[in-house]
């Protein structure tokens, strides 16, 4: 599981930073999460192949989280993309993007699907044989979801000395890895648990931005490997958080602690702050380990 931060600051422009966007690579999927201005430039800068992006997840309809989307959709057209693109987003985004394309008389030459979200409950919005994606209902000034990405349990591993000793034909190796008992060459039924090892623990990642402090999300993100939680403010400006529906670094750490996550990443920093290490120090009074997002930063959680 790998995470690339393309942008991690809040809405106000800053010459050395971009608004929210990140790419999660999990089990051969490349998921784009939010798409603020400058996203496609950062994709190029970080050498991420556009064609591998087939699913985009938009948390909410504030511009710093989706103003880069129509440009990216247009670039896909210029690159003669043929692969379908799925956008998981709040209701209303399809109307916005369609109007922009209509006024420009610039339509896609590839299948474009909008999966618009309206539920206030956590729901499964994507699933295949390897990965699930769930919404995380957040508390912001407009309808907002975070996203929980979860690997499904993978195949078991062969313990080759035991497999050879059990006299099992190679043709049955895949069945063993899938958790099936098989007949050996002598016609004896072999328990797969005796010749295989458990699969690698499935990885999980939760993206929570933008949101006020909300303990209701704790059961949804319980025990995740990595939590990205917005921390727009430091505690010295905590009075600004409730009225803007954002969180402080301390509040993000409290959520991480209650949810028993393994690693907390802080992001969505207000541009009023120059020293981001203050966010880390504040959060570490509650929870460790804490990482700070920064544009172009790469996390490898394998």
Identify the residue ranges that each predicted region occupies.
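Conserved beta-strand hairpin/beta-sheet module of binuclear metal-dependent hydrolase folds
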Residues: 1-46, 84, 147-149, 156, ...
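Divalent metal-coordination and catalytic microenvironments
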Residues: 3, 34, 43, 60, ...
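General small-molecule cofactor/ligand-binding pocket signal
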Residues: 4, 88, 113-118, 134-136, ...
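Active-site neighborhood of phospho(di)ester-bond hydrolases with catalytic His/Asp-centered motifs
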Residues: 33-36, 53-61, 90, 205-211, ...
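Active-site metal-binding motif and surrounding structural segment of the metallo-beta-lactamase
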Residues: 38-88, 116-118
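Metal-dependent catalytic neighborhoods of phosphoester/phosphodiester hydrolases
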Residues: 69-76, 274-282
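Active-site neighborhood of divalent metal-dependent phosphoester bond hydrolases
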Residues: 81-85, 91-118
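Metal-dependent phosphodiesterase/nuclease catalytic metal-binding core
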Residues: 118-266, 277-286, 302
